[in-house]
Amino acid sequence: MCKMEKFLYHRKLWEMNVKLLGESKVEKLKNSFVSRPRMSLWMIRAVTVLLLWSCFVHLMALGEMWGPRLFKGWPSCFNHHQLSTAAEMTSLPTKIALPPKRVYVNNGYLMVSCNGGLNQMRAAICDMVTVARYMNVTLIVPELDKTSFWNDPSEFKDIFDVDHFISSLRDEVRILKELPPRLKKRVELGVYHEMPPISWSNMSYYQNQILPLVKKHKVLHLNRTDTRLANNGLPVEVQKLRCRVNFNGLKFTPQIEELGRRVVKILREKGPFLVLHLRYEMDMLAFSGCSHGCNPEEEEELTRMRYAYPWWKEKVINSELKRKDGLCPLTPEETALTLTALGIDRNVQIYIAAGEIYGGQRRMKALTDAFPNVVRKETLLESSDLDFCRNHSSQMAALDYLVALESDIFVPTNDGNMARVVEGHRRFLGFKKTIQLNRRFLVKLIDEYTEGLLSWDVFSSTVKAFHSTRMGSPKRRLVIPNRPKEEDYFYANPQECLQLLDEPLRVI
């Protein structure tokens, strides 16, 4: 029985009990007190208990409806009228009890500047909160990257609910929006220490190398934060705190969350939907050197862009070699073939979680021909709905993140930060289906099919068989000692925070 049916059932039960008590027992009690003033006390108690129990049942039903939701999907037995009614009820504000503050001797202040796109910064924030907690320092709300390719001026408070971030983690670490005035003045005068921590470090590095610097300088600024904490070899409580920050401490702003709910509601009204993280934007192709399917003019444009950014060290890139090694995102044409081979219903809604696709409609034609119900946030919402986050790529990515979490199927066409962080979050939400495409395997198979070396039936059955174990089901991370870039990423499979089979880590 779904929650709405329980609610209606308990409500009828409550009304029936109230009616019986109001019209029958109350009247009898009244007469009884007149005619028999020495009525047995147990009868009064019995009636009182019955009345209280009826009220309790009713309140329990309401409690199920009004309990906090973490952007959950609606029960399948809701109709549209019940859906809108329940949505109104769950929008009522609830008072949340804050955890008690953790009391500790403060060793200093940690400032961090995150680098990269939204999800690279998201993982870095989780790491830096964890590091701050185990060094017993005060963390200043992280600064987000404003100088990278995306040139997004968004502050932390423009993307994340900063008050929730501070209060929800206060039983672990003290977080401030800014330094105390005296120390802030010192920083403005340049009297502080700044450095990038070493990548893939364990907790002993932070205890033995970083903490002494915090104590010495009082304020330490870590100016790079990507992958600065190891995937493996950390205490379980450290890993669980990383999860807690990711899944509970980091909430998007109410404005972004509300827009995400609206997009999901629009999609759900038309049935199931698949979110496709089609990472085929200009920056990805330029910096990766992947130009398969592009015309000569486009290849030249991508090369010019790569050379225009001096911080990008790799300039000369063999596109076809990278593609065959599985290091390029799938093209829209390759994606259409792959989804069809996997047996995805051509009528399913496909939500594109990405920026502007390079090559526009010309490159998207194969995908939209194969799957006519391709949509984007720009086509589902009014233009004015997106005004607040227009030209703010991280806020747009936050909206896509929310929709990706709620999708029936999530399919990324590369293994970048969004693909991996969303995959891990979907595992946490109950191992929701995420198809992890093996690009190296697929491009070889696609080339054989397009060259006429494979029939469609063989191509399709091979793709299905290979990916049958790559659907986001429970598994252990692959550990490769001293090669952290090649092993499974912690945030893609935070197994310490999940219900898994009792299996050891896979080590090669």
From Swiss-Prot:
Protein name according to UniProt: Rhamnogalacturonan I rhamnosyltransferase 1
Residues that span the membrane, as ranges: 41-63
Pathway: Glycan metabolism; pectin biosynthesis
Positions with a binding annotation for substrate: H277, L278, R279
Known catalytic reactions: alpha-D-galacturonosyl-[(1->2)-alpha-L-rhamnosyl-(1->4)-alpha-D-galacturonosyl](n) + UDP-beta-L-rhamnose = [(1->2)-alpha-L-rhamnosyl-(1->4)-alpha-D-galacturonosyl](n+1) + UDP + H(+)
Entry-listed glycosylation sites: N136, N202, N223, N391
Protein species of origin: Arabidopsis thaliana
PANTHER family: OS02G0726500 PROTEIN-RELATED, RHAMNOGALACTURONAN I RHAMNOSYLTRANSFERASE 1
Record membrane topology: Single-pass type II membrane protein
Example GO molecular function: UDP-glycosyltransferase activity
pH profile of the protein: Optimum pH is 7.0.
Phenotype of the disrupted gene, per the record: Reduced volume of the seed coat mucilage due to reduced levels of rhamnogalacturonan I (RG-I) in the seed coat mucilage.
Family of the protein in this entry: Belongs to the glycosyltransferase GT106 family.
Cell compartment(s), UniProt: Golgi apparatus membrane
EC nos: 2.4.1.351
